[in-house]
Design a protein with these regions (language model features):
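Exposed, interaction-prone regions of secreted/extracellular proteins
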Residues: 2-447
Length: 447
């Protein structure tokens, strides 16, 4: 652009207060860009939008009894249980928090450990051996040895630049409606084809009566090509119509999502919806709904350590099941830790039971219709490469009407684009029903 001519005249020096405001605004802008680790796409943000964002953050970030700084930059607020975001939900105004479900799945009991996970859930010495057993994964914020006090729950603090990475304030913390299918066969699983979401999953029949599911999931840190793509490995517990607007879904696992978290670390996550991802539900604790009860596990916090090729393998065990007496859907982590629950009031179809369970991986390919993304699923290696290279789900189980855990013997598998990501299932004694899955995305067979 050319220079702009100005009229001659005398210019008065700006008042000191004006200079101070300019410095503050510039400092805020600089800190936003740097702290987001280049994942926040800076753009001009109006004062009204910033005010709306701040009001939203004030609702999510409750006053903390104690604040813990994680080595990875996260801030963990220890919030009193009765002050957590879940209880802001209009259906939960008079909700009484359960400490533990009155009845556990019968195969293996769990217990509420306010002091954390058992030693069996974290084995630093675990390695690739003949028995193919993985070691449990922990969370990075535990490394500084500080813990939330009893009576509080750890909640990852949300910052302004976390919201700025989303398309809008409404979209923040939610799955995009564009990921929903317009039509689906009656017996098809909850997958999305042709719009950028790709899967490699195992699933049960659509007509089964299911009251929960469990699996142990290998943890990796797959590479993500662009900020608006993600890679996750999770369990889906589903009920309702796949073709309508009443699908109920409860989900949990690990996820790498630069847009949601601002980095490329694998993180423990949850999700729920009661209306096919339209208006209800969210990731983690980014809206009212999920009630956390444990003081050691922070949903949305980074998992550590992670697996590496041909070396130590680490995994997490996720259990989701319905309390047969009160109807709440509980989440267990590891062998013996209750994390919290989704109250029955949140759901329609899941207030009764689930009709399908899925286990597996999902990625977003933002280049749909063009060159395929190089975003990896699982470890970034194909299923046939096996233990130590390919990612796995092992010991797939479901909870039946008697509140008993049993191994899943009959599953179907699906990979929409097996040249990019695939899946291979099997069965043996130590791992029960299990499968390897994943892939590198873009490669000579997946251009």
């Amino acid at each position: 652009m050319g220079a702009v001519k100005r009229k001659r005249g005398f210019l008065l020096p700006p008042p000191p207060l004006f200079i101070f405001l300019i410095i503050v605004v510039f400092s805020e802008r600089s800190s936003l860009v740097v702290s987001a680790l280049n994942y926040t796409r800076y753009r001009t943000v109006g004062s009204l939008r910033l005010a709306r964002i701040q009001r939203h953050l004030d609702k999510l970030n409750k006053p903390a009894a104690l604040t813990i700084e994680s080595p990875d930059g996260d801030i963990i607020d220890c919030v009193y249980k009765r002050k957590q975001p879940a209880l802001d939900h209009p259906l939960l105004k008079n909700h009484k928090i359960q400490k533990a479900p009155p009845e556990m799945p019968k195969k293996r009991k769990m217990k509420d450990q306010e002091d954390g996970l058992g030693e069996s859930n974290y084995d630093r010495s675990s390695s690739n051996n003949s028995s193919e057993r993985g070691g449990g994964a922990w969370q990075i914020w535990h490394q500084n040895r500080r813990r939330c006090p009893k009576g509080t729950v750890p909640i990852r603090r949300i910052k302004v630049h976390d919201v700025l990475r989303a398309k809008s304030l409404f979209d923040f913390g939610k799955k995009q409606r564009s990921s929903l299918p317009l039509s689906r066969r009656v017996d098809a699983p909850d997958v999305v084809s042709g719009n950028g979401h790709e899967h490699a999953i195992a699933y049960t029949g659509a007509s089964e009566e299911v009251y929960g599911a469990r699996a142990t999931i290998n943890v990796w840190d797959p590479a993500i090509e662009t900020v608006n793509e993600f890679s996750l490995s999770q369990i889906w517990v589903l009920s309702g119509s796949f073709d309508g607007s009443d699908l109920n879904s409860i989900e949990a696992g690990w996820q790498v999502s630069p847009e949601l978290y601002g980095d490329s670390r694998p993180r423990l996550f949850t999700y729920w919806t009661s209306d096919s991802y339209q208006a209800t539900g969210c990731y983690n604790l980014l809206c009212a709904g999920f009630v956390q009860t444990n003081s050691r596990i922070a949903i949305g916090a980074a998992i550590s350590p992670v697996s590496s090729i041909g070396s130590s393998q680490f995994d997490i065990t996720i259990l989701i099941w319905k309390d047969p007496k009160l109807g709440n859907w509980w989440m267990g982590f590891g062998d013996n830790t209750l994390v919290g629950y989704w109250p029955a009031e949140l759901f329609t179809h899941l207030a009764d039971r689930a009709t399908m369970v899925e286990w597996g991986g999902e990625v977003v390919n933002s280049r749909a219709g063009g060159r395929h993304t190089s975003t990896q699923m699982g470890s970034g290696h194909f299923a046939e490469e096996g233990f130590g290279k390919a990612s796995y789900f092992r010991n797939l189980e479901i909870v039946d009407g008697d509140n008993s855990l049993s191994s899943v013997r009959e599953i179907s598998t699906l990979a929409e684009n097996s040249n990019c990501y695939d899946i291979k299932s099997s069965f043996n004694d130590p791992w029960g029903t299990h499968f390897y899955y994943g892939g590198p995305g873009n490669n000579p067979r997946c251009p």
